[in-house]
Amino acid sequence: YPPKPENPGEDAPPEELARYYTALRHYINLITRQRY
């Protein structure tokens, strides 16, 4: 599996959080696509 994106933390700037959630969604898509 690809490495899980790092959680930037509660006090991260909004663009940092947005990038994290985008990466996380992409990561989940990769994993679910591989599994099924």
Swiss-Prot record:
Coiled coil, from the record: none
Broad class of where this protein is predominantly found: secreted
Entry's Gene Ontology cellular component terms: extracellular space
Modified residues (Tyrosine amide): 36
GO aspect biological process, one term: neuropeptide signaling pathway
GO function terms (MF aspect): neuropeptide hormone activity; neuropeptide Y receptor binding
The entry's keywords: Amidation, Hormone, Secreted
Localisation: Secreted
Keyword Secreted attached: yes
Any Pfam family the entry gives: Hormone_3
Gene3D superfamilies: 6.10.250.900
Protein family according to the UniProt entry: Belongs to the NPY family.
Protein name: Peptide YY-like
Species this chain originates from: Amia calva
Lineage: Eukaryota, Metazoa, Chordata, Craniata, Vertebrata
Gene name of the encoded protein: pyy
